[in-house]
Amino acid sequence: IGSSGVIMPTSREELANAIQGYPAAPLVAGSTDFGLSITQQLKNVEKVISLSAMDSLKKCTKTEQSLIIGAGAPLNDIASPLLSAFPQLAELITRFASLPIRNQATLGGNIANASPIGDMPPALLALGASLHLDNGQQVRVIPLKGFFTGYRQTQLEKGEWISAIEIPLLSKDNNVAAYKISKRMEDDISAVCAVFNLTLVDGVVTSLQTGFGGVAATPETCPTLEGALIGKQWQSADCLHLGKQMLKDAFNPIDDVRASAAYRNQVLSNLWHRFWLENQANNAIETR
């Protein structure tokens, strides 16, 4: 792509006009994934719409209820406010690809790419995040849960882009853990990613939100597990065994170069066991 093929809007209005004028042009921010289609797959692209000059997409705001992250902000730029509010995501952030990639890659791109093995969607699902979708005329806010409709397919409508990601802040009763399993510690894609967000009141489960990657065609939650544990004593072994069985029944992962389906199912079971152990109040242990 020559310089004449890159469109760089600087405002919401310019971006909406660019999308309307070039509906086939892909939107790119850091281009850390899209760029591979050109350098490795030799894809011929006539026009791209770059979001790198859209300062309005790079803001990060914290309210009393939530953290609102601009979809076009590089991951390294948002790492500090994100980890300040959600320190449990440190492993995911620090192991996300590599430092040069994190200087370019954006949270919005990681979501819009709709990869089943993206690192951040499982965490955002478990945290109950919402997306701000803009078309230049109005912004609609939808839950991330349900946004992924199929393999690399989303609820984005014609002319829309992700402008921000809104994440509710945690309470003192939230117990969150994020686990990434990959062949390499750094610069690798998840074989399995699992994130759990558990709320306990007097040892009783009042809420459970989940997020998973690498086990289905899209980033997923496990609604059956989330509903089945409500009202149960977390310390009970029933929670452990019920969770293992429901996770086994919920997903049908595939065999690929990163892991076999059997391995992925076993890892899910092991991670649930680990999470259950780590959150036993009378037997607090560190497994990291």
Please annotate each region the language model reported:
Residues I1-R288:
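C-terminal structural segment of proteins
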